[in-house]
Amino acid sequence: MARKSSLLKRAAIAVVSVIAIYVILNASVSRSLPSSSDLPRQLIREDDDDEGRAPIQPRVRVYMYNLPKRFTYGLIEQHSIARGGIKKPVGDVTTLKYPGHQHMHEWYLFSDLNQPEVDRSGSPIVRVSDPADADLFYVPVFSSLSLIVNAGRPVEAGSGYSDEKMQEGLVEWLEGQEWWRRNAGRDHVIPAGDPNALYRILDRVKNAVLLVSDFGRLRPDQGSFVKDVVIPYSHRVNLFNGEIGVEDRNTLLFFMGNRYRKDGGKVRDLLFQVLEKEDDVTIKHGTQSRENRRAATKGMHTSKFCLNPAGDTPSACRLFDSIVSLCVPLIVSDSIELPFEDVIDYRKFSIFVEANAALQPGFLVQMLRKIKTKKILEYQREMKSVRRYFDYDNPNGAVKEIWRQVSHKLPLIKLMSNRDRRLVLRNLTEPNCSCLCTNQTGLITSI
């Protein structure tokens, strides 16, 4: 009995000893490890205290120049004077309303940055008041409006408004700014939506991020996918508020616009010749006017497909009119560039046809008549899901998406700015543009 008691005592002592050793070692190791508050933030799992939430990305800081009024509101005044809206300059030009036209992005971006930050929820950028804090600089010139101040109106020599003088004045003003000179304009953003906007000074502002409709009038060393942002035109027809369906869309194919265009737009006249005698096809010549916009709205809202040929350059506002009308775009423009293609697959709601094929008699209408109602409804659903991207009035629409695209340019801007400071001499035989090139020169087709 005594022997058994002795064994139990020794076993108990051994267990207590093991427990004591474990406690001592555990305390020692714990003291040698940092707590979670001592670890760098990037080493702590995000979902430990906020499961499921994506890391918050810092907003890009944008400084908007307070340009002289002659580059902003003064252009609204000049436009109104040229059309008899006002007889003489007004005391406060900021009370004037920006006129409606297809390149209104410049007004919407300007207005967005003038809003209080509390009204800009969800924007990928934040406006800063000190240029020293800025990542990017926005130049809010109304360059597209400047082009149409005297559109279709004769101007006597030495009098009236001059778009060329405005451009020269703008670039001289910019080149006088410390922040422009610092990086040769690379970290500046300039709206140039009309293909002819700023044409006189492009070589002096080509380092900047240009907001463009396409690259039809730009040389490779002036504009590129990597450096610049392709933006949508402002739609000129009313948004279609009905449901998807084809019951009230009795026209197969609709087009209303200028029949005669230059360059790639010459395809329009040829399409007229091919299509104007086809049944259930409406194709009309028409220029910009309120009456024609009403007719175009009705036509697009009652058609299954809308023809989108090239204009003077590969792009045209009609594509965006088609999308907001839920009228399936039929695109005949071999070199067209499209906005926001990193988030939008246009093939899901558009039909692309190579120009030579489209000009074959009967080809287009036969192809369209073979498309089943089910497929048209799929196109319409997809258009309805993405059309906010092309609506400048939508709080989560075009303006926010343009700023997102602009913010993505920042890493390249920093790279190129640092690289330019480093390189002293470059022996180049061709222009060095920061462009994304393809080794394919022909048309790329897919079935």
Curated annotation (Swiss-Prot):
Glycosylation sites (chain numbering): N427, N432, N439
Disruption phenotype annotation: No visible phenotype under normal growth conditions, but mutant plants have strong reduction of arabinose content in leaves and stems due to a decreased content of pectic arabinan.
Low complexity: compositionally biased ranges: 32-41
EC number: 2.4.2.-
UniProtKB keywords: Cell wall biogenesis/degradation, Glycoprotein, Glycosyltransferase, Golgi apparatus, Membrane, Signal-anchor, Transferase, Transmembrane, Transmembrane helix
Organs and tissues of expression: Expressed in root vasculature, cotyledons, leaves, stems, vascular tissue of sepals, petals and stamens, pollen grains, mature siliques and abscission region of seeds.
One example GO MF annotation: glycosyltransferase activity
Cytoplasmic side: 1-6
GO BP terms: cell wall organization; pectin biosynthetic process; protein glycosylation
Lumenal side of membrane: 30-447
Cellular location(s): Golgi apparatus membrane
GO CC terms: endosome; Golgi apparatus; Golgi membrane; Golgi trans cisterna; trans-Golgi network
Pfam families tied to this protein: Exostosin_GT47 (PF03016)
Bilayer-spanning residue ranges: 7-29
Membrane topology term: Single-pass type II membrane protein
Disordered: annotated span: 32-52
Record-stated family: Belongs to the glycosyltransferase 47 family.
Quaternary organization: Homodimer and heterodimer with ARAD2.
Reported function: Probable arabinosyl transferase responsible for the polymerization of arabinose into the arabinan of arabinogalactan. May function as inverting enzyme using UDP-beta-L-arabinopyranoside. May be important for arabinan side chains of rhamnogalacturonan I (RG-I), a major component of pectins. Cell wall pectic arabinans are involved in thigmomorphogenesis response of inflorescence stems to mechanical stress.
Name used for this protein in its record: Probable arabinosyltransferase ARAD1
Organismal lineage: Eukaryota, Viridiplantae, Streptophyta, Embryophyta, Tracheophyta
Gene this chain is encoded by: ARAD1
